[in-house]
């Protein structure tokens, strides 16, 4: 069977889902109590909320953030919010550009309305693309710090930085810009 990457795998799960919400959770995470309840509470706060992302804590340094949502720069770079910073600095819920696909809840109906994860991404930045599309459609992505997971990071690919991961991240960054950014911003 062909390896369809992260996107192909989650799209298959979403296609089979018969629930109002779907939760994506990486295989290198350890979930803390109240994870599901906190994500559900966050996404149910408004019908305009498309996704709610968990506080992802560095598995090896449990006092530090691995990801607290993503932000996107004017130059087209996605950045993991809070990476390496103390947990205490990220205890407040807030809007984010996108939620990390490693520990997130989505509204199934809106996922279907906006279309599946773009399988041309294969892996990496597909969650930023999904967050971008949600914003284009007028929806909100939020950070739910009460939902917590410990995240090893790159357990599937072996290392944080390897040739394939760097290639996919660079390629997907360019594709993300081309696909979603307004034409006038591309000229900057």
What are these language model-derived features?
Residues 1-17, 27:
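Glycine-rich, basic loop-to-helix element that forms the pyrophosphate-binding segment
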Residues 6, 25, 30-35, 106, ...:
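Hydrophobic/aromatic residue at the end of a short beta strand that borders the catalytic acidic motif
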Residues 22:
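Short aromatic/hydrophobic "clamp" motif used to bind/position activated sugar donors
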Residues 29-73:
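Conserved donor NDP-sugar-binding/catalytic core segment of glycosyltransferases
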Residues 51-59, 81, 144, 152:
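Short glycine/serine/threonine-enriched helix-capping/active-site loop
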Residues 73-97, 112, 174:
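Short, flexible, basic/aromatic active-site loop/helix in glycosyltransferases
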Residues 97-148:
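A short, conserved alpha-helix in the catalytic core of glycosyltransferases
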Residues 140-188:
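Active-site-adjacent helix/loop segment of glycosyltransferases
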């Amino acid at each position: 069977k062909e390896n369809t990457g992260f996107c192909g795998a989650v799209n298959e799960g979403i296609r089979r889902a018969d629930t109002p919400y779907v939760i994506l959770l990486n295989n290198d995470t350890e979930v803390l109590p109240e994870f599901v309840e906190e994500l559900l509470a966050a996404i149910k706060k408004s019908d305009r909320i498309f996704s709610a992302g968990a506080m992802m804590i560095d598995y090896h340094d449990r006092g530090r953030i691995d990801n607290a949502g993503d932000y996107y720069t004017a130059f087209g770079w996605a950045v993991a919010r809070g990476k390496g910073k103390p947990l205490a600095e990220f205890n407040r819920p807030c809007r984010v550009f996108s939620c990390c696909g490693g520990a997130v809840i989505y509204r199934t109906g809106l996922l279907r309305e906006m279309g599946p994860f773009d399988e041309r991404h294969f892996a990496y930045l597909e969650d930023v693309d999904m967050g971008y599309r949600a914003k284009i459609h007028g929806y909100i992505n939020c950070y739910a710090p009460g939902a917590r997971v410990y995240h090893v990071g790159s357990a599937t690919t072996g290392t944080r930085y390897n040739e394939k991961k760097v290639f996919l991240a660079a390629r997907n960054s360019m594709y993300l810009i081309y696909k979603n950014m307004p034409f006038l911003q591309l000229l900057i």
